[in-house]
């Protein structure tokens, strides 16, 4: 009986340890759209999104640890107006021919009940790298009904100063340099 108890305890420990292992997730590009809101001379707010992004998330929800490594294709920016898209990709703003990618790399922090509340790291954008904290307002994981793997999603918010990234276009006309990031992201557990 004593041996049986030890085996049961060992099996329980092994199961717990297996569940606590970090899980890697791949960003689902068909459900991930980094969006942004930027001031237009204090008159209105312009909104746009990036249609192509990729990356990985590694997370151990029991231990409350994780990492994020995301790349955004700056040529996929879309304001909903072709002329504005062309201007934004040009020398006045993104210079996407010279700086085709934005890259966020950081750690997941502030876990509550297995859910991260922020990602703290650096954003490389337009050839400049600055610290950025992304606030995770909503986070949930489910068993994906079609892929039969865990699928996690989040709504993420942050504000950056685009002048710190070398993009002060319009400042002389009264444009605010603050850009609000609104990111919907989904990531599926790697096979």
Per-range role (PLM):
Residues 1-19:
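Gram-negative bacterial Sec-dependent N-terminal signal peptides
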Residues 20-191:
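Low-complexity, acidic/polar, glycine-enriched regions of mature
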């Amino acid at each position: 009986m004593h041996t049986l108890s030890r085996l049961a305890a060992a099996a329980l420990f092994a199961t717990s340890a297996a569940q606590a292992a970090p899980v890697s997730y791949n960003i689902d590009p068909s459900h991930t759209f980094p969006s942004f809101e930027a001031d237009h001379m204090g008159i209105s707010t312009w909104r746009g999104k990036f249609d192509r992004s990729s990356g990985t998330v590694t997370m151990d929800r029991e231990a409350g640890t994780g990492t994020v490594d995301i790349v955004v294709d700056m040529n996929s920016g879309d304001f909903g107006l072709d002329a504005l898209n062309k201007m934004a990709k040009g020398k006045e703003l993104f210079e996407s021919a010279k700086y085709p990618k934005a890259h966020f790399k950081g750690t997941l922090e502030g876990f509550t009940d297995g859910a991260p509340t922020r990602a703290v790291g650096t954003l490389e954008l337009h050839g400049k790298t600055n610290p950025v904290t992304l606030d995770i307002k909503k986070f949930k994981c489910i068993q994906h009904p079609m892929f039969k793997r865990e699928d996690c999603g989040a709504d993420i918010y942050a504000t950056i100063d685009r002048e710190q990234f070398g993009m002060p276009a319009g400042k002389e006309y009264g444009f605010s340099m603050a850009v609000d990031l609104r990111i919907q992201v989904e990531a599926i557990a790697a096979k």
